[in-house]
Every structure is written in C-alpha cells, then in structure tokens.
C-alpha cells in the first residue's frame, strides 16, 4: 500500500468534544479511508464547552466536510443548526453535522445504531411493540426516539429516580417525543437498588 499524503484537496472531517484524547474515531475512520483509497482525513479536536458559540461560527465557514460531536457538546450545538433531522430534533442532541457550503444539517446517528442492533435480533421479523431501556441519558433518548420513529407503541425507561437531572431531562424529552410520535407511550420507572435483594 502506498503511503498516504495529505494534500490541498484532502477532505477534512473531525470529532469535537472535551475530553477528546480517548476517542477511537480517528483510528476507525482513517483506517477505513485508507482501506478504500479515499482522499480523506479524520481528526480529533478538543473544544472547550465555554467557547462553543465561537467554535460553531468558525466551523460554518471552514472547509470541513462534516464533523461529529461527543459530550458535552451534543446538546450545546443544537441551536446552531440550519436544519435538524427528526431523530436529532426529538432527542435535542446532535452528534453528526453535514456542512453543505456553510449550511449546517444536524443528525443524531446514535439512534440508528441502536435500532440496527434491535432489528438484527428480530429473527422472526415480528412487529416490535415494546422496548425496555436502562438509563435516561443521551443514548437512552436516542434509542427511545428511534424506537418511536419505527412505530414502537410502548417505551419503558428505567433509572434511579434520585438522579433528578437525568430524570427531568428525560421527562422533557418524552414530552417532545409524544408530540412527534403520538402513537408511542413513554413510561418512566424507578430502578431502586433496594429492590434488587
């Protein structure tokens, strides 16, 4: 395999967050780019959450083809999008952005990965009417959103109710979800460790 040389025509992509040094995204994406002979590079960039507004103004006009956000930026960048896809609108979080000539389109692809895993286990290809989600964090919201978009009628989310920040945030999300997918019912349940004995 010939060595890859970055040049003035190389397409640039990035993952942004803080902390970011632990991210495996550059390794995964750059290996895929090399394997398929693509003239693309994927970088990890640390972005201080206190400067997210300045970062988004800059990213809009930079020639990055797309970027990925990790915590804690996923919810912070939402208001900077020109267009938001359904999954992202419901969850209130953006993890992927397409930059089309300065027009930012926000996606939440976490939800698609969840549903692909669920569907792969549905070997009898029966309708999935109920899902059980452990936790009420960002990924739980993405999973619930995709389940509703796929027609699931009942979504049960379980968490320790003493974790009020997660619970309050999930309740607000559930309200948005009900408006977008009125056929789905979201139930929140307490996961009390005392009940495990």
Model-derived features: where do they sit?
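Short acidic low-complexity segments
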Residues: 179-197
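Glycine-rich adenosine-cofactor-binding loop
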Residues: 17, 106-111, 118-122, 127-152, ...
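Structured loop/turn residues at beta-strand edges in well-structured enzyme cores
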Residues: 62, 92, 126, 150, ...
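Short, solvent-exposed amphipathic alpha-helices that sit
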Residues: 24-34, 138, 142, 146, ...
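General small-molecule cofactor/ligand-binding pocket signal
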Residues: 43-45, 156, 186-189
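NAD(P)-binding Rossmann-fold cofactor-contacting core
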Residues: 152-180
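Phosphate/diphosphate ligand-binding glycine-rich loop within oxidoreductases
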Residues: 2-123
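Residues at the starts of beta-strands that form the adenosine-phosphate
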Residues: 12, 41, 130, 153-155
């Amino acid at each position: 395999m010939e060595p890859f040389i970055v040049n003035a025509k190389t397409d640039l992509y990035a993952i942004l967050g803080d902390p970011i040094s632990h991210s495996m995204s550059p390794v995964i994406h750059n290996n895929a780019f090399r394997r398929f002979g693509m003239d693309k590079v994927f970088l990890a960039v640390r972005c201080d959450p206190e400067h997210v507004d300045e970062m988004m103004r800059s990213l809009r006009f930079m020639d990055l083809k797309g970027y990925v956000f990790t915590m804690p930026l996923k919810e912070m960048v939402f208001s900077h999008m020109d267009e938001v896809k359904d999954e992202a609108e419901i969850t209130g979080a953006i993890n992927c952005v397409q930059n089309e000539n300065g027009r930012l389109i926000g996606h939440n692809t976490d939800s698609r990965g969840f549903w692909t895993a669920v569907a792969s286990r549905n070997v009898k290809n029966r309708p999935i009417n109920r899902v059980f989600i452990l936790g009420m964090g960002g990924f739980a919201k993405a999973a619930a959103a995709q389940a509703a978009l796929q027609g699931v009628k009942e979504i049960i989310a379980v968490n320790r109710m003493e974790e009020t920040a997660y619970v309050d945030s999930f309740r607000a999300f559930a309200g948005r979800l009900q408006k977008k997918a009125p056929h789905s019912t979201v139930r929140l349940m307490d996961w009390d460790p005392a009940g495990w004995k």
